[in-house]
C-alpha cells in the first residue's frame, strides 16, 4: 500500500437534489426528493433538508411522502445530471488520467498517477482546489476523501459530508478504524453485520482482534479474508480508469401488475428495443440475451440464450427475448420486466433473415411517447408534464412544472440565475406552453449543462438500471 | 434360433445398427437390438421412435427365429471377439454367443414388447452413394446446432423431377446443392426437412453402396418419414415439422466485385491468421487488385496479417467473417479455386468453387455467408 494519501474519492452532495435546488431557486433550503413518482417508485436522492425527516435514498416513495409530506417531489432529469456529471468528471481527468467513475456523482482518482500530489500536503491542496473548481463550474458542492487506499478514501469522504474534505494521514488508519462500526467497511450490510454482532463483533477493532481464522470460519473464505484485510486497513485495489462494461440491460417496474400475456410480450419487445439502442449507443454488440421477470409474488426469474455470434440487431434481440418469455409462466401477473445483453463484443455477426426482414425496419422502433409507468395515469396530461421538468412559455419564459392534474398544469417561472419565481396555472393543452431543455446551472461555463436534450425524459416508476457493469464509459470486454 | 455368421460381418452390422440406439432409452426394450434369422439372412434392427435402422447380412441359418438382446452389450462383445465364425443361439430367455473358445450368455428382452419398425415409404428414386454423401456433407455443414429454432437444424430436400436440391442454414450462412437422380416417377415433386445430424450419419454409412434409394412418402402411408436404403442397410427418419424460410430471394444476383483465389493457400492463410482470433472473433479480408490481405486480432491482443494472391474484378472491398464459417465454406466447395462474390461489406457474400482459375464457377453448390460488421 502507498505511503501517501494520494487516492481521492469524490462524492457529490445529494447530487440530483442539489442540481434541482440549484436550477430552481424556490427550492433552495427546502426538502427536495427526486425519484420515481409512481406508486412503486423509490427515492433516488433527497436533499439534506429532507433527510431531517428520515427520508433516504432507495426508500419507497410512499413512505417518503408520509415522512415529509411538504417536500417537493420531482421526476429525475437524467440528461441534465449526466451533463453536469461530465463537467465534474472532466475536472477529475484534469487531475489525473486514472479516474474511476462509480456512478454519475462518485469517482476515485489516483492523484499520484497524474503527478497532482505526492504527499499529504499536496494532496490536500489538490482536493481543496478540486472542490473550489467544482463549485465554480457547476455551482454544486462535493465532498472529498483522501487516503492511501480506495476503501479509506471512501470512508473519508463519507466523514467529510456534506461539503467537506477529510484526509486520513497514513499510519493513523488503524487507530481511526478501530472504534468504527463494522458496517463502515464495504461489503458489510445488514446480514453480515448481524452475523458478526451475534458473534460479539461490532467494531472494526474487534474484527482485527478476532483474527483471520475466526473471520473465515464465520463468513467463509473469500468474504472472511477480504474483511479481515480491510479491518487492518489493508486495501491494495488500484484505481482502474475504465471498468469494462460486462452487460447492458434495461428494466421497468410497472405500477400495476401486468396480467395480459400479449401486453407482457409487447413490453418485452419494447425493452429489447431500448436495450439495443443503449447497446448501439456505446458501439457494442452481445451474444447472450437475458430476460428477467419478477412476478406478482416477487419471485424473480432470469432466462438466457446465447447466440453463435454477437448481434446488435433489434429484431434478433426481440426474437430471442420473445422465445425466452415463452418459457416463463406469467399467469399471476408480472411487476417487473427486464432485457439485457451480455457477452459483449465490438463486432456483430450479421444475420441473414434479420437483414432480409430488417430492410423494412433498420432501426429499433422509436420509443413511443407513453412509457409503461405512466400508461396508467388518469389523464394523458400528466404524461406530458412530469413534475420538475422544464417548460417554456411564449411570454413568461422559462419555468418548471410544479404539478399537474385535473387538466391543469402549475408552472413556476424561474431560472437558475433568477430569484424565486411566480407560479401560474394553465390548461394542460395551452398552446403557449412547450417542454424545454434544462438550463445550465452556472450561466457562463463552456459546454455541458446547456446541451440540447430531447425534451422531457420519459421515465419508468423505478430508476432504470442502465449499466450493470458500472463505469458508463464506452469500454469493451472481449469474450 | 440358431445361426452362424462371420465375425467381421457381424461386428460391422452390429456396430452400424447399434449407432441409432438411444443413449437413454425411453422404454427398456428400446435398448435392445432385434435379431431376426430367416431365409439365409440375419437382419439386425434398432429403433428409438425417431430413427430406425435395419441391416441384413448373409448367415448360415440352422433354425429361424427372432431374439431381442442388449444392443450395447452385443456391440461390445462382437467387437472384442476373435476372428472366428460366431454362433448365436437362443434357449428360453437366454441367448448364447459362442466364438472360438469364448462363450457369452445374454439375457433376452421381450420381443413381443418391441415396437414395430416404421414402414419404409415407397421407393422414389436412386442416386449414386458417393454423390449423395458428398452433397449431404456440403450442405449439412451450414445447419444450425441448437434447438432454439428446430427448423434450422434440418436439411431441406426438395425433389423436382430428376433434380434434387439440398439446402440448410443456421441463419449465418446458407448452403445449397443441386444434383441429378433417377426418380421412379419423372413428375415427382416433394419437399422434406430431415434432421441434419441423422442425415449426415446416414449418408456416411451408405457411401459403400453403389446406389442409394431415397424413399420419400408424398402423402398417405408413411407420411412424415424419409427412408434411405443401400448396401443392405436401410434406415428411416422422422421428418422435422415446418420448412426453411424461403431462400431464393436471399441469394443476391448482382455483385459489385468478384474475387478468385486458389483454395488451398487461402485456407492455410485463414487458419494461420485465425490463430489469434480467439473465440471466433472475425478475420478481416481486404481485396485489392491482385492481392488479398487477411488480418485478425486486435491491438489489445495478438495480431496477424497475411497476403495471398487473388484476382479481383470490380470494386476493392474490405469485409470480415467468422473464421469458422469461412473455413466451413472453403472446405465444402471442394474445388481447387474459390470464387467469392460481394455486393457490400455488410451484405451476404456468395462462395462457390471453380475447377480452375479461368474456368466458370460450379453452379451446383453455393455457400452464402453473412459477414461480420465491425463497429468503429
From Swiss-Prot, chain A:
GO terms for cellular component: cytoplasm. Gene3D superfamilies: 3.30.70.270, 3.40.1170.60, 5' to 3' exonuclease, C-terminal subdomain, DNA polymerase, Y-family, little finger domain. Pfam families: IMS (PF00817), IMS_C (PF11799), IMS_HHH_1 (PF21999). The record marks 16 as: Substrate discrimination. It catalyses: DNA(n) + a 2'-deoxyribonucleoside 5'-triphosphate = DNA(n+1) + diphosphate. CDD domains: PolY_Pol_IV_kappa. One of its GO terms (molecular function) is magnesium ion binding. Belongs to the DNA polymerase type-Y family. Monomer. Poorly processive, error-prone DNA polymerase involved in untargeted mutagenesis. Copies undamaged DNA at stalled replication forks, which arise in vivo from mismatched or misaligned primer ends. These misaligned primers can be extended by PolIV. Exhibits no 3'-5' exonuclease (proofreading) activity. May be involved in translesional synthesis, in conjunction with the beta clamp from PolIII. This is DNA polymerase IV.
Curated annotation (Swiss-Prot), chain B:
Signal peptide: none annotated. Keywords: Cytoplasm, DNA replication, DNA-binding, DNA-directed DNA polymerase, Nucleotidyltransferase, Transferase. It is found in: Cytoplasm. InterPro entries: DNA_clamp_sf (IPR046938), DNA_polIII_beta (IPR001001), DNA_polIII_beta_C (IPR022635), DNA_polIII_beta_cen (IPR022637), DNA_polIII_beta_N (IPR022634). One of its GO terms (molecular function) is DNA binding. The keyword Transferase applies. Coiled coil: none annotated. Its main location: cytoplasm. CDD domains: beta_clamp. Pfam families: DNA_pol3_beta, DNA_pol3_beta_2, DNA_pol3_beta_3. GO terms for cellular component: cytoplasm; DNA polymerase III complex. GO terms for biological process: DNA strand elongation involved in DNA replication. Forms a ring-shaped head-to-tail homodimer around DNA which binds and tethers DNA polymerases and other proteins to the DNA. The DNA replisome complex has a single clamp-loading complex (3 tau and 1 each of delta, delta', psi and chi subunits) which binds 3 Pol III cores (1 core on the leading strand and 2 on the lagging strand) each with a beta sliding clamp dimer. Additional proteins in the replisome are other copies of gamma, psi and chi, Ssb, DNA helicase and RNA primase. Confers DNA tethering and processivity to DNA polymerases and other proteins. Acts as a clamp, forming a ring around DNA (a reaction catalyzed by the clamp-loading complex) which diffuses in an ATP-independent manner freely and bidirectionally along dsDNA. Initially characterized for its ability to contact the catalytic subunit of DNA polymerase III (Pol III), a complex, multichain enzyme responsible for most of the replicative synthesis in bacteria; Pol III exhibits 3'-5' exonuclease proofreading activity. NCBIfam families: dnan. Belongs to the beta sliding clamp family. This is Beta sliding clamp.
Amino acid at each position: 500500500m502507498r505511503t501517501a494519501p494520494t487516492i481521492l474519492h469524490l462524492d457529490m452532495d445529494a447530487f440530483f437534489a442539489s442540481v434541482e435546488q440549484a436550477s430552481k431557486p424556490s427550492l433552495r433550503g427546502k426538502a427536495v426528493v427526486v425519484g420515481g413518482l409512481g406508486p412503486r417508485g423509490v427515492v433516488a436522492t433527497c436533499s439534506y433538508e429532507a433527510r431531517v425527516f428520515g427520508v433516504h435514498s432507495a426508500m419507497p416513495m410512499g413512505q417518503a411522502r408520509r415522512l415529509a409530506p411538504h417536500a417537493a417531489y420531482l421526476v429525475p432529469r437524467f440528461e441534465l445530471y449526466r451533463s453536469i456529471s461530465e463537467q465534474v468528471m472532466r475536472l477529475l481527468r484534469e487531475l489525473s488520467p486514472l479516474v474511476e467513475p462509480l456512478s454519475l456523482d462518485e469517482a476515485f482518482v489516483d492523484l499520484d498517477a497524474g503527478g497532482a500530489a505526492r504527499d499529504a500536503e499536496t494532496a490536500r491542496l489538490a482536493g481543496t482546489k478540486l472542490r473550489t473548481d467544482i463549485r465554480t463550474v457547476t455551482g454544486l458542492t462535493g465532498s472529498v476523501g483522501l487516503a492511501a487506499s480506495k476503501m479509506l478514501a471512501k470512508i473519508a469522504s463519507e466523514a467529510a459530508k456534506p461539503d467537506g474534505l477529510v484526509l486520513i494521514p497514513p499510519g493513523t488508519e488503524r487507530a481511526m478504524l478501530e472504534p468504527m462500526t463494522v458496517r463502515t467497511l464495504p461489503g458489510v450490510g445488514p446480514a453480515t453485520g448481524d452475523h458478526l454482532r451475534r458473534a460479539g463483533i461490532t467494531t472494526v477493532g474487534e474484527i482485527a482482534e478476532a483474527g483471520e481464522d475466526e473471520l473465515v470460519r464465520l463468513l467463509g473464505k473469500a468474504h472472511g479474508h477480504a474483511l479481515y484485510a480491510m479491518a487492518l486497513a489493508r486495501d491494495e485495489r488500484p484505481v482502474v480508469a475504465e471498468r469494462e462494461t460486462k452487460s447492458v440491460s434495461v428494466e421497468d417496474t410497472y405500477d400495476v401488475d401486468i396480467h395480459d400475456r400479449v401486453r407482457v410480450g409487447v413490453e418485452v419487445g419494447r425493452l429489447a428495443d431500448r436495450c439495443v439502442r443503449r447497446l448501439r449507443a456505446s458501439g457494442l454488440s452481445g451474444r447472450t440475451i437475458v430476460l428477467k421477470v419478477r412476478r406478482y409474488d416477487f419471485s424473480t426469474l432470469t432466462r438466457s440464450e446465447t447466440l453463435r455470434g454477437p448481434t446488435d440487431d433489434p429484431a434478433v434481440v426481440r426474437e430471442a427475448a420473445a422465445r425466452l418469455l415463452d418459457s416463463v409462466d406469467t399467469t399471476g401477473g408480472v411487476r417487473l420486466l427486464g432485457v439485457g445483453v451480455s457477452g459483449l463484443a465490438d463486432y456483430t455477426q450479421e444475420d441473414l433473415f434479420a437483414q432480409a426482414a430488417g430492410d423494412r425496419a433498420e432501426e429499433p422502433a422509436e420509443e413511443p411517447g407513453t412509457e409503461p409507468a405512466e400508461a396508467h395515469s388518469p389523464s394523458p396530461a400528466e404524461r406530458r408534464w412530469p413534475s420538475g421538468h422544464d417548460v417554456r412559455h411564449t411570454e413568461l419564459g422559462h419555468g418548471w412544472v410544479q404539478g399537474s392534474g385535473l387538466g391543469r398544469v402549475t408552472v413556476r417561472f424561474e431560472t437558475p440565475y433568477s430569484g424565486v419565481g411566480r407560479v401560474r396555472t394553465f390548461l394542460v393543452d395551452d398552446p403557449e406552453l412547450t417542454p424545454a431543455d434544462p438550463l445550465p446551472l452556472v450561466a457562463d461555463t463552456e459546454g455541458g449543462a446547456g446541451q440540447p436534450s430531447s425534451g422531457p425524459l420519459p421515465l419508468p416508476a423505478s430508476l432504470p438500471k442502465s449499466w450493470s457493469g458500472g463505469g458508463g464509459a464506452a469500454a469493451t470486454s472481449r469474450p | 434360433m440358431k445361426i452362424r455368421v462371420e465375425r467381421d460381418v457381424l461386428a460391422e452390422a452390429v456396430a452400424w445398427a447399434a449407432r441409432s440406439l438411444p443413449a437413454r432409452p425411453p422404454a427398456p426394450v428400446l435398448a435392445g437390438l432385434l435379431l431376426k434369422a430367416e431365409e439365409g439372412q440375419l437382419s439386425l434392427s434398432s429403433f428409438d421412435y425417431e430413427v430406425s435402422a435395419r441391416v441384413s447380412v448373409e448367415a448360415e441359418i440352422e433354425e429361424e427365429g427372432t431374439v431381442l438382446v442388449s444392443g450395447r452389450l452385443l456391440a461390445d462383445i462382437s467387437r472384442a471377439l476373435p476372428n472366428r465364425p460366431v454362433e448365436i443361439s437362443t434357449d428360453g430367455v437366454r441367448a448364447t454367443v459362442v466364438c472360438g473358445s469364448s462363450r457369452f450368455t445374454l439375457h433376452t428382452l421381450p420381443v413381443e414388447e418391441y415396437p414395430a419398425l416404421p414402414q419404409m415409404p415407397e421407393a422414389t428414386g436412386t442416386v449414386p452413394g458417393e454423390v449423395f454423401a458428398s452433397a449431404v456433407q456440403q450442405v449439412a455443414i451450414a445447419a444450425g446446432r441448437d434447438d432454439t429454432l428446430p427448423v434450422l437444424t434440418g436439411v431441406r430436400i426438395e425433389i423436382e423431377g430428376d433434380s434434387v436440391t439440398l439446402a440448410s442454414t443456421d441463419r449465418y450462412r446458407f448452403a445449397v446443392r443441386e444434383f441429378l437422380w433417377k426418380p421412379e416417377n419423372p413428375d415427382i415433386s416433394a419437399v422434406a426437412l430431415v434432421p441434419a445430424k441423422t442425415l449426415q450419419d446416414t449418408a456416411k454409412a451408405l457411401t459403400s453402396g453403389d446406389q442409394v434409394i431415397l424413399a420419400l412418402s408424398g402423402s398417405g402411408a408413411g407420411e412424415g418419414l424419409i427412408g434411405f436404403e443401400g448396401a443392405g442397410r436401410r434406415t428411416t427418419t422422422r421428418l422435422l415439422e415446418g420448412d426453411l424460410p424461403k431462400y431464393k430471394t436471399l441469394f443476391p444476383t448482382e455483385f459489385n466485385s468478384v474475387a478468385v483465389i486458389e483454395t488451398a493457400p487461402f485456407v492455410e492463410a485463414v487458419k494461420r491468421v485465425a490463430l489469434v482470433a480467439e473465440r471466433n472473433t472475425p478475420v478481416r479480408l481486404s481485396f485489392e487488385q491482385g492481392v488479398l490481405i487477411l488480418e485478425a486480432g486486435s491491438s489489445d491482443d495478438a495480431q496477424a496479417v497475411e497476403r495471398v494472391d487473388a484476382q479481383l474484378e470490380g470494386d476493392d472491398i474490405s469485409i470480415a467473417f467468422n473464421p469458422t464459417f469461412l473455413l466451413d465454406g472453403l472446405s465444402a466447395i471442394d474445388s481447387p479455386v474459390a470464387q467469392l462474390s460481394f455486393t457490400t461489406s455488410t451484405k451476404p457474400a456468395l462462395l462457390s468453387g471453380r475447377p480452375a482459375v479461368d474456368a466458370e464457377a460450379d453452379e451446383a453448390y453455393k455457400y452464402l455467408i453473412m459477414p461480420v460488421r465491425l463497429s468503429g
